[in-house]
Amino acid sequence: MLKAEGRTLIGGPVATSTPNGLAELIDDAQPFLRDHWRRRPVVLRSADLPTGSLTLDEADAALGTGALHSPYVEMVRTDRIIPREAYCTSRTVNRVDHPGYADAARIRALLHAGTTLVLRCVEQWHPGTAEFTRRLGRDLGRKVEAFFFVTPPGAQGLRLHRDDADVFVVQLNGSKQWYVHQGPDSPQWRPGPASDDEPPVVSPLLRTGEVLYIPRGFAHYATGDSGLSVHLSLTVRDIATADLQRAAQQLLFEAAPANRRPLDDDSMLADARALLEQLTSRLPALTPEQLLTAARAAQCAEALPQLSPGLTELAASLGAPPS
């Protein structure tokens, strides 16, 4: 369960106060958590955009340096695959050519031709976005990733598809027409392309400053409307059964001897007996809630720590050279 200021937020009674990261997306978290979280899509409005998240000016500057590299940079459209060579170039470092670096001129030309720009995993290379995703992740008890989409008017970057995540779409510029279809009807669903057998359940026109919430697995696609559409997709990852299996193995066998190589059958049988004894003693005490918490904690730990090499602190500690 998720706690905020000592109160259960998700998985129990609704909190009486809005948590930090979620407050930057939603004016009032209580109705959202009660009526929409993991249930159905909704358009939300917030007075402020996420603090410190990537802006269009910063994206322009990052692409202008040419330092961004594939796969952080991608161009997509529904009618054909855009090869990396169409929007990337080589950089020469120490007289060696290294391919795959963003080419600002090619990206601009493809945008004019109706192609969508995607900046992937922004939290891995933009400090402000990294800090916001950490705040939101703490509030929701999940791992959060960020993707930055730039779509020209009338263009569609991705086909109808399902994401293995809950998604908050934050419209930063222009507007975009969204079509959200129903979620999966069984736990055996797979992320990726989806069929449009049924009409969308909601089809909002998302404007600057609005936030669209799409529950995990709900199929969706979007087209650029007026102006240059820019949005930040905050993908809230959750675990699957395989994660529960790994967590169970870790909890049940965490104290078991590792890296042993018994040299005879008697020693091997003794180790097998010890493992079974540990399993039978630990299993009755393990609860489903503990297993779920451990699996989600392990997933959240996968997020990059965003550590700095501390060059400024190192310079200060060494002091200035004598004059």
Question: Can you name each region flagged by the protein language model?
Answer:
Residues 2-35, 48-53, 57-210, 218-259:
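Active-site region of the double-stranded beta-helix
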Residues 244-283:
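Charged, amphipathic alpha-helical linkers/stalks
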Residues 270-323:
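Long, low-complexity C-terminal extensions of enzymes
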